[in-house]
């Protein structure tokens, strides 16, 4: 018989098969036709991934059935799942994992049955049989987990023609789900639907319960005219606003919509797109702003000002600017006056090179300040390397040179093997595989060369997600230094880090050697969750003690708090939760101990085991 195999690119392959063919045979036929190795193929039918050893007839695949071919991407990745309580779970997945697999992993971690889980990404509810790569979910993406509440309800949707549609929904349904149900009933594509409740337009990624829509509520359906689209507006605080617009809307209209949402008067708004400030009378389509484009909103500080730009030839240019202008805007104004392309301009103020995306007010540039304009020469440049002895070496380099290349040049000049060199710039240790331009090292920058003492060593830091980070340290490094290195690698602020070794929390001012941490030791990194919580500890006498703790506290810390309150030495305490004895080096969050949980304290008898 014939069956069809559809790829993600939309191509359909026709195969001659027998009902008794195994999935392995089918993959071999696909390899013959398309050259795709079987171990990179995943076949899906009726939402299920097919197993190699089963046959077509096992899956009731009949003539002219269509299978879906998904390529298994090499390599695992981490993703995050955020619950409505704000808790974030980290999962190890592959792009080829199905949503069903992901729900099973969540069940393993959190105990929530898959049939009560609904996963949302980019405002869409994810279907069990599809894969992460189908939804373009990449490493470090965040999914949202919504629990499916038992028991549905009816709501009504009223159209502009006066017709009322009845829908069966759940409070946890997203607006997108509701639009899909309307499409099923009425045939109106979701992208032409706008739903209004209590005077508010409802956003696709939100749920009915977010809007407090209850049973027998009535929504109003307005059809979105062709050409309607969503755009995003990002403020300097990092907040992103979503707007419904048409390509023919003027910038003035857009500012009015922002005023409706955020209360900012239009005359205080400046909108930037592709580095350009947008003019009120022009339209979105004039600027080629398309659906899902992001504009940047800068607040116009009252009153413009003049600044001066001095070139290396001694010429001074006067510019009219606002504190909220970006450096990119300033370079555009210089281009207008002097004809110098922005990519050849480097602006310096107070000895610092200014970055395009920052504003004048970010750098505290005030009226009548003077900037210095340096032309960016094509090609090579000189940099300096300063050693701890105070000697300065001059090197000829290119921005595209790697740190490894630079170390080789230092070896040529000074004879120091690269593996004994550590280069520091702007307080950061530079990694071999990165380039000078990655670190924004420009001509006449100064790097600092530190020799890697033979006491240098590697240690490992293990996070609660199971990820292990490798750090280059010295025994004399303080815990504060180690936290700074973790921040460089992982972006976690030191004040949110707690490091544990041998069951003890490490103090910032102490050194690794104080704690006898040697090469290849493993530290445990616990995130200090914002805000503590209370838990209760019940003794066998029936007395209940209340403790102030953090989810990241170790059991050892908790025992120390009990000792402070009750005078019982930690080595005589045994703590029980959910029938399990708790181990000293683990944290409260490891055991899913949440606020107002009750632990049981049992005294360890002398001589006992």
Curated annotation (Swiss-Prot):
The modification ADP-ribosylglycine is found at residue 76. It comes from the Eukaryota. InterPro entries: Ubiquitin-like_dom (IPR000626), Ubiquitin-like_domsf (IPR029071), Ubiquitin_CS (IPR019954), Ubiquitin_dom (IPR019956), Ubiquitin_ubiquitin-like (IPR050158). The keyword Membrane applies. One of its GO terms (biological process) is protein ubiquitination. Keywords: ADP-ribosylation, Cytoplasm, Isopeptide bond, Membrane, Mitochondrion, Mitochondrion outer membrane, Nucleus, Phosphoprotein, Repeat, Ubl conjugation. One of its GO terms (molecular function) is protein tag activity. The record marks 68 as: Essential for function. The record marks 54, 72 as: Interacts with activating enzyme. Transmembrane segments: none annotated. There is a cross-link at residue 76 (Glycyl lysine isopeptide (Gly-Lys) (interchain with K-? in acceptor proteins)). Residues 1-76, 77-152, 153-228, 229-304, 305-380, 381-456, 457-532, 533-608 form the Ubiquitin-like domain. There is a cross-link at residues 6, 11, 27, 29, 33, 48, 63 (Glycyl lysine isopeptide (Lys-Gly) (interchain with G-Cter in ubiquitin)). The modification Phosphoserine is found at residue 65. PROSITE patterns: UBIQUITIN_1, UBIQUITIN_2. GO terms for cellular component: cytoplasm; mitochondrial outer membrane; nucleus. PANTHER family: UBIQUITIN. Belongs to the ubiquitin family. This is Polyubiquitin-C. It comes from Gorilla gorilla gorilla. The gene is UBC.
